């Protein structure tokens, strides 16, 4: 069910990050060097989740693994226990909550018309449903964290925090962001571009789908213009 996936990605997954923030406040303040294994594990987990995304053929699985990779960055930022890290982690949780939920919604829109979630079988929608393709492009650009979105602000804060803590982490972060951009563009091109299947009786998009996407992306864009609301 699509509603379950949207709630899971947008809210329940972020409760784990919220729990870590709360636990860090009651733990005695220790040197972050003690948390080095956990930070490396979080970043390495983010890279592995991104690599798993690259080899996914199922649209829904790809979006789910994408959420896991972003949570790796959140965990690493929280564990460092700096103000910038906490701000970046909270901003990324909110931004990715909107983005991943929107992507799940779009995946369901595609599934209702093609009855398949295999990437290569859902291609050619840019000719049939240009508005849906526009929503896909916007959601993927936010997933990549292009400026001036909140995703970009939050990832910049997390990157600054990790680089200030240990400059070597920029290699892992850079690799993670490169793979994120790769699979996001791959997902967009595979599901929207290419030749349109013959004898395709596709019903047009409904107003409720456009409304749902607007309610996902409009708040995110508005928060992006005034990030001090949450940072």
UniProtKB/Swiss-Prot annotation:
Q: What membrane topology term does the record carry?
A: Multi-pass membrane protein
Q: Which Pfam families match?
A: Proton_antipo_M
Which GO terms of the cellular component aspect does the record hold? mitochondrial membrane
Q: Which cysteines are joined by disulfide bonds?
A: none
Q: What is its main location?
A: mitochondrion
Where is the protein found, in the record's own terms?
Answer: Mitochondrion membrane
GO BP: any one term: electron transport coupled proton transport
Supply one GO molecular-function term.
ubiquinone binding
The main enzyme category here is: translocase
Where do the TM regions start and end?
1-21, 34-54, 61-80, 84-106, 128-148, 169-189
Mind listing the UniProt keywords for this protein, alphabetically? Electron transport, Membrane, Mitochondrion, NAD, Respiratory chain, Translocase, Transmembrane, Transmembrane helix, Transport, Ubiquinone
Q: Reaction(s) catalyzed by this protein?
A: a ubiquinone + NADH + 5 H(+)(in) = a ubiquinol + NAD(+) + 4 H(+)(out)
E.C. numbers: 7.1.1.2
| Function in brief | Core subunit of the mitochondrial membrane respiratory chain NADH dehydrogenase (Complex I) that is believed to belong to the minimal assembly required for catalysis. Complex I functions in the transfer of electrons from NADH to the respiratory chain. The immediate electron acceptor for the enzyme is believed to be ubiquinone.
Recorded family membership: Belongs to the complex I subunit 4 family.
What is the protein name stated in its UniProt record?
Answer: NADH-ubiquinone oxidoreductase chain 4
């Amino acid at each position: 069910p699509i509603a379950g996936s949207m709630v899971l990605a947008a809210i329940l997954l972020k409760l784990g990050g919220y729990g870590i923030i709360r636990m860090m406040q009651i733990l005695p303040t220790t040197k972050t060097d003690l948390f080095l294994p956990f930070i490396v594990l979080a970043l390495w987990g983010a890279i592995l989740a991104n690599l798993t995304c690259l080899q996914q053929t199922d649209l829904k699985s790809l979006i789910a693994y994408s959420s896991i990779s972003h949570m790796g960055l959140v965990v690493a930022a929280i564990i460092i226990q700096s103000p910038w890290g906490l701000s970046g982690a909270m901003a990324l949780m909110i931004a990715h909550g909107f983005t991943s939920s929107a992507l799940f919604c779009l995946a369901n829109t595609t599934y209702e018309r093609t009855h398949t979630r295999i990437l290569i079988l859902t291609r050619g929608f840019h000719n049939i449903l240009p508005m849906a393709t526009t929503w896909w492009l916007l959601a993927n650009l936010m997933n990549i964290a292009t400026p001036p979105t909140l995703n970009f602000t939050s990832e910049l804060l997390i990157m600054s925090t990790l680089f200030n803590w240990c400059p070597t982490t920029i290699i892992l972060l850079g690799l993670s962001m490169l793979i994120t951009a790769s699979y996001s563009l791959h997902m967009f091109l595979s599901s929207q571009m290419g030749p349109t299947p013959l004898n395709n009786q596709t019903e047009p998009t409904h107003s409720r789908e456009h409304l749902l996407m607007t309610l996902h992306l409009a708040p995110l864009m508005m928060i992006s213009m005034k990030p001090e609301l949450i940072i």
